[in-house]
Curated annotation (Swiss-Prot):
<protein>
    <recommendedName>
        <fullName>FAD-dependent monooxygenase ntnJ</fullName>
        <ecNumber>1.-.-.-</ecNumber>
    </recommendedName>
</protein>
<feature type="glycosylation site" description="N-linked (GlcNAc...) asparagine">
    <location>
        <position position="124"/>
    </location>
</feature>
<keyword id="KW-0560">Oxidoreductase</keyword>
<feature type="glycosylation site" description="N-linked (GlcNAc...) asparagine">
    <location>
        <position position="264"/>
    </location>
</feature>
<comment type="similarity">
    <text>Belongs to the paxM FAD-dependent monooxygenase family.</text>
</comment>
<keyword id="KW-0503">Monooxygenase</keyword>
<dbReference type="InterPro" id="IPR050493">
    <property type="entry name" value="FAD-dep_Monooxygenase_BioMet"/>
</dbReference>
<feature type="active site">
    <location>
        <position position="187"/>
    </location>
</feature>
<dbReference type="Pfam" id="PF01494">
    <property type="entry name" value="FAD_binding_3"/>
</dbReference>
<comment type="pathway">
    <text>Secondary metabolite biosynthesis; terpenoid biosynthesis.</text>
</comment>
<dbReference type="InterPro" id="IPR002938">
    <property type="entry name" value="FAD-bd"/>
</dbReference>
<dbReference type="GO" id="GO:0016114">
    <property type="term" value="P:terpenoid biosynthetic process"/>
</dbReference>
<feature type="binding site">
    <location>
        <position position="54"/>
    </location>
    <ligand>
        <name>FAD</name>
    </ligand>
</feature>
<keyword id="KW-0812">Transmembrane</keyword>
<keyword id="KW-1133">Transmembrane helix</keyword>
<keyword id="KW-0274">FAD</keyword>
<feature type="binding site">
    <location>
        <position position="41"/>
    </location>
    <ligand>
        <name>FAD</name>
    </ligand>
</feature>
Length: 420
C-alpha cells in the first residue's frame, strides 16, 4: 500500500455496508490512512448504471487527492449554467462558474468505477459482492450475513442507503418513515451520435455548460457527462402517486412526451430521442435521522440524510461524511478514544446536513412557480443579478456549501470533546 496521507495512529478494522459512492468513498479514505477495510455489498454484480451526478469543486479536489479521479474518469468541470424559459426556450441568463471553483458533472457509473479502481490499488481494502447483511449486533460489533456468516469489526459504517437494514437498529421506530414530495424524475442519457445531426442539440453535449428550463410544477436540466460523449437529461415532474417507495419504475416515452408537450421545441426534440422506456424515480422526503451513532456503528450518506436533487448536494455531502469519519478515526491516539471520535463525526456533520436538507426542499418552490407573473418576476431578478455580477439566491446558497472544510470541522469537534 502506498499513499501520501498521514498514517493513522491507531489502526481499526472497519466494515462498510454498501458499495455505493458514499460507502466506497469512506472505504478509500480510511484505507488511504492505513485502516483495514471490508466492504460488504448485497448485489452480486456492480453494473455501473445510473445518470449524471454533480460534484462540487471541493469534492472533486478531495477525490483527486485520494487518488480516485483521473483524466480518464470522464468528469467535466462546467463553465456555468444557462437558464431558459420553459415554453419558448428563450435565454433568461447565463451564470458563469463561481471564482471558488466549477461545479463538475460525472456519470454515476463512472464515479463508482473510479472508486472501485482506486480500491483495487489498495491492499487493505477487500470488497465482497453478494454479501447481504441481514442483522447487526451493536454490542459485539458483528454483522450477520444472509448465509449465516458473522463478521466482526471495530467500527461498522452503514452506507446502505435510504432502505438501510442497519438504521432501525440505531434510530427509534418511525425515524425512517418517508413522505412523498409529490414529484418524480425521469432520467435518461443520450449518446453524442444521436445528437450529431442537429446542431442545436449537439451544442448541448459539446459545450461544458448545463442548461435548465424552469416551468410550472416542473423543471428540466441537461448537461454533458463522460467526456462529452453523453448528454444527461433529468426531468422533474408531478408524481402520479402510482409508484411505490422504490428506487425506480419504468415509464413509456409517450408519458414523458405528454408531460412536456407544451414546452419548448429543443426539449421536445431531446425527449423524442429518449429510449422507449424511461426510468422514473419517485422522490421522497426523509426526516433527519435523530441519531447517527450507536456503540461503534455509524450511519453515512443516504442512510442518514437522503438529499433531494434540487441543489445537487447528494454526492458532495456523502463525500464530506467520508472525509469526517476518516479524519476522526485517523487522528485519535488511543483505542479508548474511539467513542469520542464517533461522537465528533456526528457533531461535525449532523446539524450541517439537516440545514442543507431543509434548504434543498425549499429550493424547489423557486424552481416550480406556477403563476406566470411570479415566473416573470423571478426571471427578471435572475437577469438583473447576472448583469450586476450578483448570483441568484439559489446559486449563492449552493456556492456557500463549497467552502466548507469537513476535515477541519471534524478535527475541531474531536479536539473539543477530548479536551473537555
Amino acid at each position: 500500500m502506498s499513499n501520501k496521507h498521514s498514517a493513522c495512529q491507531v489502526q481499526f478494522r472497519v466494515i462498510v455496508v454498501g458499495a455505493g459512492i458514499g460507502g466506497l468513498s469512506a472505504a478509500v479514505a480510511l484505507a488511504n490512512r492505513g485502516h483495514s477495510v471490508l466492504v460488504l455489498e448485497s448485489t452480486t454484480k456492480l453494473s455501473h448504471v445510473g445518470a449524471g451526478v454533480a460534484l462540487p469543486p471541493t469534492t472533486r479536489k478531495w477525490y483527486e487527492s485520494e487518488g480516485v479521479l483521473r483524466a480518464e474518469s470522464g468528469c467535466i468541470p462546467l463553465d456555468g449554467i444557462e437558464l431558459r424559459k420553459w415554453d419558448t426556450g428563450e435565454l433568461v441568463t447565463r451564470t458563469a462558474a463561481n471564482p471558488i471553483g466549477k461545479q463538475n458533472a460525472i456519470h454515476h457509473g463512472d464515479m463508482q468505477q473510479a472508486l472501485l479502481a482506486r480500491a483495487a490499488q489498495l491492499d487493505n481494502i477487500s470488497i465482497r459482492l453478494g454479501a447481504r447483511v441481514m442483522d447487526i449486533d451493536i454490542d459485539s460489533n458483528t454483522v450477520l450475513l444472509h448465509n449465516g456468516e458473522q463478521v466482526e469489526g471495530d467500527v461498522i459504517i452503514a452506507a446502505d442507503g435510504v432502505k438501510s437494514v442497519i438504521k432501525p437498529k440505531i434510530c427509534p421506530p418511525g425515524a425512517s418513515k418517508a413522505q412523498s414530495t409529490g414529484e418524480a424524475a425521469y432520467r435518461f442519457t443520450l449518446a453524442r451520435d444521436l445528437l450529431k445531426d442537429d446542431e442545436e442539440l449537439l451544442d448541448l453535449v459539446q459545450r461544458s455548460w448545463a442548461t435548465r428550463w424552469d416551468g410550472p410544477s416542473r423543471h428540466v436540466v441537461a448537461y454533458p457527462v463522460r467526456n462529452h460523449q453523453l448528454l444527461n437529461v433529468v426531468l422533474i415532474h408531478p408524481d402520479d402517486g402510482n409508484t411505490e417507495e422504490s428506487w425506480t419504475t419504468v415509464a413509456d416515452k409517450q408519458d414523458v412526451i405528454e408531460h412536456y408537450q407544451d414546452w419548448n421545441l429543443t426539449l421536445n426534440k431531446l425527449i423524442h430521442l429518449a429510449p422507449t422506456q424511461v426510468p422514473n424515480f419517485r422522490m421522497f422526503l426523509y426526516p433527519p435521522s435523530p441519531v447517527w451513532v450507536k456503540g461503534s456503528t455509524i450511519l453515512l450518506g443516504d442512510a442518514c440524510h437522503a438529499m433531494l436533487p434540487y441543489l445537487g448536494q447528494g454526492v458532495g455531502q456523502a463525500a464530506d461524511d467520508a472525509v469526517a469519519i476518516a479524519t476522526v478515526l485517523s487522528t485519535i491516539e488511543h483505542r479508548e478514544q474511539l467513542p469520542l471520535a464517533l461522537q465528533a463525526y456526528e457533531v461535525s456533520r449532523k446539524s450541517r446536513v439537516e440545514q442543507i436538507q431543509a434548504a434543498t426542499y425549499q429550493a424547489r418552490e423557486h424552481l416550480h412557480l406556477k403563476d406566470r407573473e411570479a415566473q416573470a418576476a423571478r426571471d427578471l431578478q435572475r437577469k438583473s443579478a447576472s448583469e450586476s455580477n450578483q448570483n441568484s439566491d439559489v446559486v449563492k446558497m449552493q456556492h456557500s456549501y463549497w467552502v466548507w472544510d469537513a476535515a477541519k470541522v471534524a478535527q475541531i469537534a474531536l479536539t473539543e470533546l477530548i479536551t473537555g
